[in-house]
C-alpha cells in the first residue's frame, strides 16, 4: 500500500505530551494529519517536529470541526482512505494495517473497539450501536473510511 493514499487524521487539543509519539507511530502507515484545535500548548510544534501535516484552528472549534478540517485536508491530498485516531495515544497503531486491509477489501467503514471500561452513557450508546447497527463501540475514535 502506498502510504500517500492513507490519511491518518488526528484531532488534538493540548496534546503536546503525547502527539509526537502518536505521529511517529503512525508514519509507516499513512500521512499523519494533526488538526490542532486551538491548543494553548506546544501541540503544533511537537506534531510538526514528528513529521505531521498540521491544520491549525485559531480557536477551539470542537471535535467535529477538527475532523471536518482533517477530512478536507485528506481530500486536498487525494487520499483514498482516512483513518481517525485520538491524540492521547489510547489507540495501538499496530492495528492500522488491519484497518487498511479491511478498507482495501471493500469496506466503507471500519470501527475500532476500545478495551477500557466505559462510562454509563457510553455503555448505553454502545448497546444501542450493537442493537441497531451491529457496531460494538460507536464512540471509539479509531475509525477507517473509504473516500468516495
Question: Which ranges hold each PLM region?
Answer:
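A transmembrane-helix-recognition feature enriched in membrane-embedded lipid enzymes
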Residues: 119-137
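Structured catalytic core of nucleotide-sugar glycosyltransferases
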Residues: 1-119, 145-148
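Conserved nucleotide-sugar donor-binding
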Residues: 127, 140-148
